Amino acid sequence: MRVAIAGYGDLTRYICEEFVKAGHVLVILTRSYKPQLESQGVAQAITDYSPSSLRAPLADCEVLISTISDISSAYTNVHRNLILACQESPRCKRFIPAEFVADIEAYPDEPGFYYAPHEPIREMLRGQTDLEWTLVCIGWLSDYFVPSKNRHIKDIGEFHPMNWAGNKIVIPGTGNEPVDFTWARDVVRGLASLIEAPRGSWEPYTFMSGERSCWNDATRLAVQKYRPGIPIQHVSLHSVAGMIKTAKDENTEVLADYYLLSISQACAIPTDKVEAHREKYFSGVTFRSLRDGLCQVDEHPDSIL
């Protein structure tokens, strides 16, 4: 199957590996030439994401997946053009926008900084019938718990409880709130399987998970393996409310939104829906637990999980 991928970021690096293994043919939509794609034998199309510049690359693709993550209005503008281009395309009638976070079916406004740029695109998809689409929900990526040499996913500093650069762990809430964790490579393998599902079989929301856990348990595993003695603290809901009241910059507001994302339990992916979608879409995909991935690092210390 010929698949277009909008954006060449961290997740796309896994896509270039796993989709090719699955037998799919890729074309990466990118604003600038990426020489590394040439060495992988992956096609690329230079675009400014205007509908006219997307017309030719999408003409012979069957599916478009966006990995463009942005918390500004640029996300809305680019994704609106991606939808319009798919509607004009004679073949590309399936679209997966860049979501890949929480249970946005139950918590559409989590994380808070996602809502304003993302919700107009969700509404645009709901209001049309030309394209088949789905919003993919995965919880948190497990990859942040391993050293950077073992992942394509970049560090996000204090926005993740395990702050490698800061050498500290800051856990929102009690740390016992349920959170689902999924490895990025498994998400991509799931996407490669999802696009092979029969036309008309996609649901508005698709759920994936490697395991249900919580921040206390997940960080305990990582601390034992990588950072014994690293300082650990918890941030209460009351403290987060205070952060929001006194925030003087966007970074503090975004950090508070990340804290609320965990405290609200929005990253607990519905177990019944995870199981239903494993049976419906992902019967050939193995979703690894956090411990599974850490064991793989032991066996292959220089591998990208």
UniProtKB/Swiss-Prot annotation:
Swiss-Prot/TrEMBL catalytic activity: L-pipecolate + O2 = L-1-piperideine-6-carboxylate + H2O2 + H(+)
Superkingdom field: Eukaryota
Enzyme class: oxidoreductase
EC number(s) on file: 1.5.3.7
Pathway terms, separated by semicolons: Mycotoxin biosynthesis
Keywords: NADP, Oxidoreductase
Coiled-coil residue windows: none
GO molecular function, one term: L-pipecolate oxidase activity
Pfam family, one: NAD_binding_10
Gene3D superfamilies attached to this UniProt entry: NAD(P)-binding Rossmann-like Domain, UDP-galactose 4-epimerase, domain 1
Functional summary from the UniProt entry: Oxidoreductase; part of the gene cluster that mediates the biosynthesis of swainsonine (SW), a cytotoxic fungal alkaloid and a potential cancer therapy drug. Swainsonine production occurs via a multibranched pathway and is dispensable for fungal colonization of plants and infection of insect hosts. The first step of swainsonine biosynthesis is the production of the precursor pipecolic acid (PA) via conversion of L-lysine (Lys) to 1-piperideine-6-carboxylate (P6C) by the aminotransferase swnA, the latter being further reduced to PA by the reductase swnR.
Family the entry assigns: Belongs to the NmrA-type oxidoreductase family. Isoflavone reductase subfamily.
Name the record gives this protein: Oxidoreductase swnR
Lineage, highest ranks first: Eukaryota, Fungi, Dikarya, Ascomycota, Pezizomycotina
Gene giving rise to this polypeptide: swnR
